[in-house]
Design a protein with these regions (language model features):
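Short, surface-exposed ligand- or partner-binding patches at beta-edge/loop junctions that are enriched
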Residues: 62-63
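Rhodanese-like catalytic fold shared by cysteine-dependent sulfurtransferases
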Residues: 1-18, 25-58, 67-121
Length: 121
């Protein structure tokens, strides 16, 4: 699986990389990770918006906890996309690694799933 831990990301603001938040629009408007090249394409709309995914640059998918972004990755790979990764643990692990977000995540996000900020366990 092509996953990347938030504490290993150091090049996410490069112009060649596109971050796609696959949460619903209302979630994205409330809070999101603080990176330059980010778009919101909800998992529920990916099939209708598949043409918005570039096939010539790396795409990193993110959601709240990694579940939807992993599903999106599998869906896109089945349709021929190859330059894909997803953020393991999603925004939860992003926050646990003290990385910046825009907006205010609810307290439950920062306390859900895991108290461990590392990945791969």
């Amino acid at each position: 699986m092509k996953k990347i831990c938030p504490n290993k990301i150091n090049t996410i603001n490069e112009k060649e990389i596109l971050v796609v938040d696959v949460r619903e629009n209302f979630e994205f408007k409330e809070y999101r990770i603080d990176v330059e090249n980010i778009e919101n394409i909800p998992l529920s709309e990916i099939d209708n918006k598949i043409q918005e995914f570039p096939d010539n640059r790396e795409v990193i998918l993110v959601c709240n906890n990694g579940l939807r972004s992993e599903m999106a990755l599998k869906f896109l790979e089945q349709r021929g996309f190859r330059n894909l990764k997803f953020i393991e643990g999603g925004i939860v692990k992003w926050i646990q690694n003290h990385l910046k977000i825009i907006g205010n995540a609810p307290d439950i996000v920062s306390h859900s799933l895991s108290l461990d900020k590392t990945c791969g366990k």
